[in-house]
Amino acid sequence: MMSVDKSLEIVSSAQEEGSVLSTLSETLPFAIGVAASAVAVIALVLILQGSRALSSGLSFTLGWVLGVGVVCAAGVAFGLAVSDDPARWTQWLRTLLGALLLVAAIRKWRQRVPSGQEPTPPKWMSGLQDSAPGKAAVLGFLLGGINPKNLMLTLGAAATLGASGLSSSEVWITGIAYVVVASVTVLVPMGIY
């Protein structure tokens, strides 16, 4: 039977700087933030109710995964390229991204529909049920990667990956894990369909 000291030693070694598990645990909140996108689930449900459900649904899902993946890869590549002092630039990037998210939240709050009025659905949602696979893929890419919230969260995760001290292969493997977790809310419904 393993002693408590041995268990604590294993846990602390997994949390050391440069550890894959430590980096995964640092990127997990970012991935959950991206995955918790109700807009993606709503769009996918609307697409799956259409006449081209399978092809457009797969295209949307692929577009989402590629959108998150491209942004993450670009951020990681940038982070690895400027890795002279990763701690300094990642702190500034995280501060900037946090401030941008705060500004976006305040802006969204001010633009909310007043109580008692019926909200109108966004224009991009009209016609989703009969969208072509190409349109669905582009929409998935834009919602997954270019959506301001997801863009900032994914760049935050990429900054964490770039400053992690892991080897290049470990960074890319951890990045793939991030993309999978960030895409789980579109992968699971599509897989069930």
Protein language model features and the residues they cover:
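Alpha-helical multi-pass membrane helix bundles of inner-membrane/thylakoid proteins
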Residues: S3-E16, A104-P148
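Juxtamembrane transmembrane-helix termini in multi-pass membrane transport proteins
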Residues: E9-D85
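Membrane-interface helix termini and inter-helical loops of multi-pass transporters
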Residues: E16, F78-R88, T160-E170
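Structural signal for alpha-helical transmembrane segments and their flanking helix-loop junctions
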Residues: L21-S56, P122-G191
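Membrane helix-loop-helix hairpins that form the core translocation module of multi-pass transporters
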Residues: R52-S126
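Structural signal for alpha-helical transmembrane segments and their membrane-water exit/capping regions
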Residues: Q111, I192-Y193
